[in-house]
Amino acid sequence: MAREKFERSKPHVNIGTIGHVDHGKTTLTAAISATLAVYSGSKKDISLIDSAPEEKARGITINTAHVEYETETRHYAHVDCPGHADYVKNMITGAAQMDGGILVVSAADGPMPQTREHILLAKQVGVPHLVVFLNKADQVDDEELLELVELEVQELLENYDFPGDDIPFVSGSALLALQAVEGGPKAKGDDKWVDRIFDLMESVDNYIPAPERDTEKTFLMAVEDVFSITGRGTVATGRIERGILKIGDTIEIVGLKDTQTTTVTGIEMFQKTLDEGMAGDNVGILIRGVQKTDIERGMVLAQPGTISPHKKFEAEVYVLGKDEGGRHTPFFTGYRPQFYVRTIDVTGTIVQFTGDDGSAAEMVMPGDRIKMTAELINPIAIEQGMRFAIREGGRTVGAGVVSKILE
């Protein structure tokens, strides 16, 4: 059977549901999928969402369910994770990138510990925009109570530098909406609970901006291998991470040594020459006036002035539990693992650990999430939001995302 062609007629946005356990994230995901089936004709059953398949990202197993749906103006890919640990791992590894999120809070219970934790994570790992759905509103008879919960959530969002006053809030009942559409598709105006789902998606359409596509960003490619071709010069190979590169462009070689500037004299892919390479292409780039010894795996080629080498940074890290193939014992400040960044392992020291409340921690247990400050022995091209793995003798013991560059 031929695969159905992906129609690229509407702009594509990646979103996800976040929030405390049992506040209704998965039910909401199913309700959105079923409600919007009026536009696309397909919906995903709740039992399929809950039994999410395992995926591997940077050596970590994560359960995530992917659901697609469409509104009148957009195509969405929606990620929902069954367990709290899966959320933490997904957000830190960036296994399913989110351009925005729907924060689900039970109106009957108000914000809970994981509500706070997911907002903090969204801030740290760069989920730029959130919309709030106050679920289980059918269980709240008092309008004032709903307003109180809304104020509480607003305050929580403000604490983590989200614009609480601007963020759209929609209240409703995912369960009642789902039950209503199970009897057949509903148009706007047919059912008050289904209408709340339409309202929610209208807020998502309007408030969460379409992301800048990889090809629109500045050029960057991590070097995987280097060859020299007699009479022509040095070729660096790798996959273009973002942007577009044309013959004749000036680029910088960043990381490990002093930054060098050079000119692109040729671009090849599968033994054919190209005028330009773009995000996603595996290419060989011929560069002028650079010796093979001047460039090595782990450096990056980038548009001049867009990325610089650093040694010290803060990161949000998930440490693998022993049942995930991680360490069996805790590690302490001063621990020296390898940080696997893009294409290279660099040794670094963990200078300090910080808990969510800002208190210093001396040690970290397998299975923990922690904020850490790390210092590498060699400077490499690092930027905020960049993902990495922490390895020890070749096995992954943690995953992280850079939240702040220090020096």
From Swiss-Prot:
The alphabetized UniProt keywords are: Chloroplast, Elongation factor, GTP-binding, Hydrolase, Magnesium, Metal-binding, Nucleotide-binding, Plastid, Protein biosynthesis
Annotated segments matching region G2:
59-63
List residues binding GTP. Answer: 19-26, 80-84, 135-138
CDD domains according to UniProt: EF_Tu, EFTU_II, EFTU_III
Query: Could you list the residue ranges forming a coiled coil in this record?
Result: none
**A GO term from the CC aspect:** chloroplast
Subcellular localization is given as: Plastid, Chloroplast
EC number(s): the record gives: 3.6.5.3
Output the Gene Ontology terms for molecular function.
GTP binding; GTPase activity; translation elongation factor activity
Residues bound to Mg(2+) are T26
Pfam families found in the cross-reference section: GTP_EFTU, GTP_EFTU_D2, GTP_EFTU_D3
Q: Top-level EC class, please?
A: hydrolase
User: Which residue ranges are recorded for the region named G4?
Assistant: 135-138
Family, similarity comment: Belongs to the TRAFAC class translation factor GTPase superfamily. Classic translation factor GTPase family. EF-Tu/EF-1A subfamily.
* Record-given protein name: Elongation factor Tu, chloroplastic
Q: Which organism is this entry from?
A: Emiliania huxleyi (Coccolithophore)
Q: Which gene encodes it?
A: tufA
